[in-house]
C-alpha cells in the first residue's frame, strides 16, 4: 500500500483518486470484501483498454490479483464490454489456467458482460448493473469502499489502473513518480484517432499538453 501511495498512481478511469489510499480505505472495512474491475470502456473513441488486454493480458491479471490480495477480496467481478468477445474468451482461458495451477486460491473470479451503456463508466452505476439492476448512479455517501457490490466493501478499478500495479512493484514507486509534467506524476495512455498522421494508443507523461 505504501508503495502505491508513494508512486502517485491514481485511478485512471476519470476520477483520479489515489490508488494506495483507496486500498487502505477498503482494507480497513469489515470482511468479506469484494473487488470490481470496469472494463466496459464505453467512452466514444476510447480503445486503450482493448489494446492492453489483447497485447499483455497477464500484466492486467497480475495487477488485479495483487490488488485483490492486498485488500483480501474474496471475489473479483470483471465487468467487460460486450463488444470485446475476443478479450472475454481469451481472459477466461487464462483464468482457467490460473485456477488449475492454484494461483488464485483465495479469490474467485467472475465475468459479467456490460451492455455498452456510457453511464456504467461511473462506478456506482456499474455496481447497479453488476447486481442485475438498471445502471443508474447511487447517492453518496456511503461510498463503494464502505457499501459497494452486494452491500459489501468493494475495491473498484479500471483496466489501466491495475495494469500499472505490477510494473510499479517491479521497478519501484520512484520510477513511476519520476515521470510526469506540469505538476503531475506517472504515465498515461491516450487513444488517438481521427484525421491524424499516427493514430493508435500512445503512452506519455501525465500532465502532457496536446501541443507537446
Predicted regions and their residues:
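Conserved alpha/beta core surface patches that mediate binding of polyanionic ligands
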Residues: 7, 12-30, 50-56, 170-175
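Short connector loops/turns at beta-strand edges and beta->alpha or beta->beta junctions
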Residues: 39-44, 69-73, 195
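Conserved phosphate/anionic-ligand binding catalytic regions in large, soluble enzymes, centered on
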Residues: 4-25, 116-128, 132-134
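Hydrophobic alpha-helical positions that pack around
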Residues: 88-206
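Short amphipathic, charge-patterned alpha-helical segments
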Residues: 63-65, 207-212
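Histidine-anchored nucleotide/phosphate-binding helix
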Residues: 56-70
